[in-house]
């Protein structure tokens, strides 16, 4: 970048690594089935509980990417379908446009008997992991990396890392 002034304020830097209040994520059979169908999965383990149990799962397993699905709960969510109200802080920046820079989910479960399945109740919390500035072909950009940690009975079962690009 040139000698442009940084849009990353001290307040923004202080927010890096600060974990939000936890919120509850209930994994439900209907949600698993709908997500699997929408994505195009055809494996019966995502639709039929008997098939899932034959493969060693406790119930219908979460398909890859399921945890990244936004869930609107009127009691806890932003009415504009954003993050939970107690999720990550939002900051004012001069940028008016945004892009999803991608999502990666790392699972810490060990095999089918330990997989995240329908019926699980997870606790999730999020934090800003990093803020960086770069110059792209359209000008300066603010890149925000966030992490959402999913716990089952206090044990981390997955971490979702997402990248947002403001420009």
Model-identified regions with their sequence ranges:
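HotDog/MaoC-like acyl-thioester-processing domains
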Residues: 1-13, 103-167
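Hot-dog-fold acyl-thioester-processing enzymes
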Residues: 2-102
């Amino acid at each position: 970048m040139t000698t442009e002034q940084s849009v990353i304020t001290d307040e923004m830097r202080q927010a890096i690594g600060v974990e939000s209040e936890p919120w509850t994520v209930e994994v439900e059979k209907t949600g698993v089935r709908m997500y699997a169908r929408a994505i195009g999965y055809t494996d019966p383990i995502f639709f039929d509980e008997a098939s899932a149990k034959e493969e060693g799962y406790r119930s219908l397993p979460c398909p890859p990417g399921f945890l990244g699905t936004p869930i609107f709960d009127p009691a806890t969510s932003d009415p504009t379908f954003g993050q939970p109200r107690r999720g990550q802080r939002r900051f004012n920046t001069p940028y008016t446009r945004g892009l999803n820079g991608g999502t990666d989910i790392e699972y810490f479960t060990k095999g089918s008997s330990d997989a995240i399945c329908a019926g699980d109740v997870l606790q999730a919390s999020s934090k800003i992991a990093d803020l960086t500035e770069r110059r792209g072909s359209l000008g300066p950009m603010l890149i925000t990396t966030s992490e959402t940690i999913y716990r089952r009975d206090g044990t981390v079962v997955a971490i979702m890392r997402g990248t947002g690009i403001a420009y």
